[in-house]
């Protein structure tokens, strides 16, 4: 509900009792929620001081972003989890995801002012998150992109009964990519590249 109203960070203050295996379950739950809602997800469980004769609380804290656990404290250690969440990334992911549609209808928003605090970032943010650092994975990713584009163009050329593909060449990288895709599409259709 909060994510559909536009929240990019959701805090879950929980009183989840501790049992054997519960920490692993909690990690999976928090990771899945953050992925499903395309958000930063803060999970803070009741701590040791809340334990009773019937229930034991471990104070397990977790922070996840879009399916990845970024930070957590160990259950029973009394510490805190802290990190940064890339809210702009979450907004971009939502804009790209066609099955995620914002709807704030019936949602009550409480306005407040908050002065930004001076802080030092502790998390490395990849400046090129969609370009794998590993050369083999990068080559595989590029090949997949070319295949996807060529397949889409081939389908369009077939559907339009086009005899040729016309490309405006400026000498830039975009027109170079367009030419590579067009050649692959023609090859896929069993037609000469000159078409």
For the regions a language model picked out, list residue spans one by one.
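CN hydrolase (nitrilase-like) catalytic-core segments centered on the catalytic cysteine
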Residues: 1-81
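Short hydrophobic/aromatic-rich motifs at helix boundaries and adjacent loops
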Residues: 2-4, 121-126, 187
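Short acidic (Asp/Glu) and glycine-rich catalytic loops that position anionic groups and cofactors
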Residues: 10-13, 126-131, 161-162, 195
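Short acidic, gly/pro-rich beta-turn/loop elements at beta-sheet edges
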Residues: 21, 93, 177
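Glycine-rich loops and low-complexity Gly/Arg-rich segments
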Residues: 34-38, 66-69, 87-89, 95-97, ...
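Flexible inter-domain linker/hinge segments
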Residues: 80-157
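ATP-dependent adenylation/nucleotidyltransferase module used to activate substrates
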Residues: 114, 137-195
